[in-house]
Every structure is written in structure tokens, then in C-alpha cells.
Amino acid sequence: MAIPGRQYGLILPKKTQPLHRVLQKPSVFGSDSDDDETSVSESLQREAAKKQAMKQTKLEIQKALAEDSTVYEYDSVYDEMQKKKEENNPKLLPGKDRKPKYIHNLLKAVEIRKKEQEKRMEKKIQREREMENGEFDDKEAFVTSAYKKKLEERAEEEEREKRAAALEAHLDVTKQKDLSGFYRHLLNQAVGEEAAPKSSFREARTVIKEEKLRGYPDETNSESRPPQQSCVLQRGAQEAEENPDADREFDDESSEDGEKRDHKVKSRGEDTGASMKHPKHHKNRAHSRSSSEERGLGTKHHSRGSQSRGHEHQDRQSRDQESCHKDRSHREEKSSHRHREASHKDHYWKKHEQEDKLKGREQEERQDREGKREKYSSREQERDRQRNDHDRYSEKEKKRKEKEEHTKARRERCEDSGKHREREKPEGHGQSSERHRDRRESSPRSRPKDDLDQERSSKARNTEKDKGEQGKPSHSETSLATKHRLAEERPEKGSEQERPPEAVSKFAKRSNEETVMSARDRYLARQMARINAKTYIEKEDD
């Protein structure tokens, strides 16, 4: 059971119902004058309340103004607030104050291109004048003031570019032997004596810093320098020769000492050669002036400064001596190391050259040997060919002569045997033999037997001839004998040829002069006839 007086959940206030005014019913016997009196009194009360409220507000305004006179300056306060907002937020600034991001770089690039184009045109005009070869030298050349100004500006720009190139060469770390100048500039930038270089290359080209020489108050003139500092001077001169950037420092001009620096620049312009040759002497003069100015400040400050300067001077002398000894030892080590490297390199290159020479000689010798071998082999091959050809030719000649002699001897024997048979055999017997031969030739069975008989007879004759040749005299004697026989037989043949020739058939019996020879003898005879008819010699295959 919940307690009746308490509520749970979201409690919302109830809307108060407007009170309905209870209208009095007008009485029949009432009069209108009573209503007029009530309305007048109410209006008077309202006016009195208004006047009282006005007086109250005036009093409050006076009190507030007495406390703070700027209480009711709303517009000025609002304007100040808006200005602060605009200052804090740069995006809300008007467009006139905003600067473009990229157009100034583009304009610089356009100017550079214009100047380059002008230089090109000048070179082109110069070439055209050279091509003319002085045709128009007698005529006047008009030069305007604007062109003169342009030439002056161009000369100034060329000087600036030369300075920028020299500055870049001095600041280039790759061209320096050590990093002393780089670390000195880095230290000056960290301390604040030198402004850090800008990243933009074009800004670095246009904005070129002037080179300033900084002096130290503890240094004295070069004439009054003690003999102990000669080592320091030598080291400084060597560093200036080796590293031109080591003794150069760049400082930004300040508003306080602007006049002094202008005076120094003028004096430097008068004595440029002396300052370039002896930069430390120039430093000493500048620092002697500064020390003379400082002397007039006070005796106490002077005494303290002189004591501190003396200590610093001694420390610096000791440091300079130590650094001089270190530099000497370092240079000696460097020179010895370089000498060793150079000797090592020379030895290495000499070794390589000797090896290359040896290799080249070996290659030449090999090539000569190979060439000689090739020549010798080619010559030997030619000689062998000539010998083989000569041997073959001689062998062929021998074979041919032997065959000729063999055939001649065979013919002679055949002729002798034929004559002897003609004498012995009668004519009848010759006719029967001829018939018998014709029958043999006509019958096909008897042909192979006849061939076999002929071959056997030819073989037997050959063997007899070989035996007879062994027992016979030499070829020259046989040739003479054969010549005599042929001479004797010629008249007999001539008498036989005088007789009228008879029609001889194809298969007729041959005469005794045309003796039958074997197939092999006929073949050899044909071959010999062909060989004798040829004017050249055939090469036989191996």
C-alpha cells in the first residue's frame, strides 16, 4: 500500500486554471455614476505606479553611472570584441591584407626568363653584326637612356651572380677538405650571430649576404705580436689557402651599430687588396679601435678586463701551440699516408701492366705458332698433293706403256701364228673349220662353251707370254724386232690390199689376219685405243 501523500516518478507542475471573474449582475435600481468613480480611481493609481517606477529606474541608472561610466556603451564594447576575434582568427581578415602564396615565385621566374631571353637576343644581334663584317661601321648608332639603364642593371646582376657563385663555392661542403667552416656557421646560427639560410633557392640567389670579418678584443696588432704566435699565423695562412670558407663569417646588420658597419665597409672598399692578403691584420686594426673605445669606460673595468684578457691570452697561446703541434703531426701523417697510398697504387698499377704485357706476349707467341702451323700444314698438304699427283701420273704412264707393249706383242704373236697356220692347213680343212665355227656361232648352246674355251685359251696364252717375257730380252730390243717385222709385212699387205674387196657378210668367216681373240683381249684393245685418243689424263680415285 502506497502512502497517499507521496508521488513517485516524474512530477510535473499542474497548470493553474485562470480564475473566472464573477460578473455582478447589474441591478435594476443601480446608477452609472458609481462605475465612473471606480474607473477614475484605478487610472490614477496606474499613473502613480508608472511614475514611481520611472523614478526608481532613474535612480538605478544614476547609481550605475556613478559606479562605472562605461556601463551603457554597448556598441563600442561589441566593436572591440569583434576586432579581437578578427585578430585572433586570420581567416576573417579582409582580402586586402592577405598575401598570395605562389604568385610572387611565379613572377620571379618570369623575370628570370625575361632576362635570359634578353641575353639570347643580345647574343643573336652580336652574331649578326659579326656576319656583316663591318658593313655599317661608318653609320651612327643611337643608344637611348632606357637601353643604357638596362645595360647598367644587367652588369649589376652579373656581378651579383658572380658573388652568389663564389659564395656557393665557398659554402659547398664537397669542395672543402674539412668541416671547420661548416661547424663554425652552424655554431653562429645556433648562437644567433648569423641568420639561418632560407630553403628557397631563388630567394638565396636574389638575397645575397655581405661578407663581414669579425674581430676579437683580446687580439693586438700584427707588429706587436709575440714570436710565439708565428705558428698560429702560419696555420691560419695555410687554412686560408686550403679552405677559403674557414676564415669567412656572415653577420646580419643591426639597427644599433649600422653607422659603424657602413664606415667599416667604406674603409674596406679602399683597402681591398690588403684585406684579401692579410685578413687577420684587418681584424686586428678593427679590434684595436674597439679596445681603444672600451678603455674610456672606467679604470676598474679596464683593470678587470686586462686581467681577464691576460689569462685568456695565455690560454689561447697555449691552445694555439697545442693545435699547431697537432696540425703538424696530422699533416705529416696525412702526407705519409698519401705517399704510401700513391706508392701502393703505383706498385699495383705496375704489377697489372707487367701482367698485361706478359699476357699480350704469350697471346702473340701463341698466334705466331698457330699461324706457322697453319702455313706449314698448308704447304705440306700442297706438297703431298703434288707428290701424289706425280706418283699417280707416273703409275698411269707405266701402266699405259706396259699395256701398249703387251698388246703389240700379242698382235705380233697372233699374226705369226696365223701365217704359220695358213701355210700348214689345206684349204679344205679351212672350209670345214669355218663351217664348224659358223654352226657354233649359230647354235645358242654352244656359245657359252665357246666363251669358256676362249677364256681358258687366253689365260694360257697370258701365262705363256709372261714366261716368255721373262726369258726374252728387254723392251727396247723387242720393239726394234717388231719394227723390222712390220716393215717386212707392209709390202705383203699392200699386195693383198690391191686385190678387189669382196662383199663380206656380218656372220662370215674371218680371215687369218683378223684372228679371233678372246672377249677380254678385245676389251683391252678398245680401252687402249681410247686412252691413246685422249689428250688429257684422268685422275684415279683412291
UniProtKB/Swiss-Prot annotation:
Stretches of the chain forming a coiled coil according to its record: 103-172, 372-413
Compartment(s): Nucleus; Nucleus speckle
Domain of life: Eukaryota
Pfam families tied to this protein: NRP1_C, NSRP1_N
Record has Phosphoprotein as a keyword: yes
List of residues that carry Phosphoserine: 27, 31, 33, 254-255, 443
Region (Necessary for alternative splicing activity): 105-169
Biased composition (Acidic residues): 239-256
Amino acid composition bias (Basic and acidic residues), ranges on this chain: 200-217, 257-271, 309-335, 343-475, 485-501
Swiss-Prot/TrEMBL keywords: Acetylation, Coiled coil, Isopeptide bond, mRNA processing, mRNA splicing, Nucleus, Phosphoprotein, RNA-binding, Ubl conjugation
UniProt record, GO biological process: developmental process; in utero embryonic development; mRNA processing; regulation of alternative mRNA splicing, via spliceosome; RNA splicing
Region Disordered, annotated ranges: 21-53, 190-516
Gene disruption phenotype: Mice show early embryonic lethality shortly after implantation.
Compositionally skewed regions (Polar residues) per UniProt: 223-232
InterPro entries, alphabetized: NRP1_C, Nsrp1, NSRP1_N
Family indicated by similarity: Belongs to the NSRP1 family.
Function of the protein: RNA-binding protein that mediates pre-mRNA alternative splicing regulation.
Protein name: Nuclear speckle splicing regulatory protein 1
Protein's organism: Mus musculus
Gene this protein is translated from: Nsrp1
